[in-house]
């Protein structure tokens, strides 16, 4: 049975598939690169409050072509 990917891994894989660096994604989203890395690592301790994080994740998913 194949291991299930987490949402952070899915976002990272989609970004890499588009050939996009974290810095590029951060500039386009106007989000700090360390926050994008925290999203990909699912490190909730480094993320802003839940409402902001949810909006950032949604914007990131749209940027990399995920719904």
What residue ranges belong to the model's regions?
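Cytosolic/nucleoplasmic/matrix-facing N-terminal domains/tails
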Residues: 1-67
């Amino acid at each position: 049975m194949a291991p299930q990917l987490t949402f952070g891994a899915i976002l990272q894989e989609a970004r890499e598939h588009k050939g996009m660096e974290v810095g590029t994604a951060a500039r386009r989203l106007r989000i700090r690169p360390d926050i994008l890395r925290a999203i990909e690592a699912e490190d909730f301790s480094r993320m802003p409050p839940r409402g902001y994080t949810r909006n950032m994740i949604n914007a990131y998913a749209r940027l990399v072509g995920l719904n």
